[in-house]
Structures are given as C-alpha cells and as structure tokens.
Amino acid sequence: MPEGWAVCCLENVAEVLDNLRKPINSNERNSRIANKHESELFPYYGATGQVGFIDDYLIDGKFLLLGEDGAPFLDKYAIKSYPIKGKCWVNNHAHILKPLCDFDYLMYYLNHVDYKDYVNGSTRLKLTQSDMRSIKILLPPLTEQKRISVKIKYLFCLLDTIACHL
C-alpha cells in the first residue's frame, strides 16, 4: 500500500444518516401527490435511483445514496451508489451517506466494491447498516482522492464522446 494511504471502514469515512429516512407505501404516496402540479413535488429516491415524486421532503443537501435492498450488488458494472442534491425524500431501500472524504472518490469506490461478503439474502440481496458500516475503503490522502476522481470523470467523459461518434 502506498505511503499515506489507509484502509478504513465506511463508517469512518462517511456519516450514516439512515435515521432521516421514512418509509411510505405507494398508496399513501400516490394519494399525497394526486392533483398536485409537478412544481409542488420533490424527488423520491430508492435503492437504484429516483422512483417517483412526493409532496414533501425529508432532507436538503448533497448526499450519496447506497442501495440497501434491491440494488444490483453482484453486478460489477451496475450502479449501487449515486449522488443526490437538493430537497428530496429517501425511502428505506437506500442508505443515506454524507462523505467525510472526497465525495466522488467514495461514490466511485462504492460502485466497485465486491459486495459478496457484505450482502445477505437468497432472492433479494440486502446490505444491512451494520454490514455497510464495515465495508473496507482504501483511502488515499485527500489530494490523491481528488486526482483519482478527476481522472475517472475525464475517462467517463471520453467514453461518452466516443459512444456519441459510433
């Protein structure tokens, strides 16, 4: 391991804010948004992204969401962690994280973790909060985290450009 790098548990590099989640069933959510204009609604997020809208918000800010159940944990190319920003509602199928390290570095890292030792379940995989907290994160110094994040963003932009020209 390079000098200055450390192996940390996720709970030491991100604040876990699962206490801000509030489950709501689809019938109640649908009744709350009935007859409301889209401008009166807020994004409603689940394990893999936005799953709808709701008439209120529980959090406001920039957060990283990581699937709890229903996420494609064993697909190494699939998104398991994604950014959200602004006023929104997160359901109980996603963990809410506030990174204490470089935001993008942690997001990219969590999308490439091998989750097989962290998830449970036979038909629907679940990442419990305690297992999530124990995920090992290889953490370089902050300047290196930022350099890695910038390079990954550049490479994704390059891929997008190439894909547009195919």
What is the predicted role of each segment?
Residues 114-118, 156-158:
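A common structural junction motif
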Residues 1-30, 34-46, 139-166:
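Non-catalytic DNA-recognition/assembly elements of restriction-modification systems
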Residues 46-50, 54-111, 120-133:
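A short beta-sheet element
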Residues 135-137:
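Short low-complexity linker/loop segments enriched in small residues
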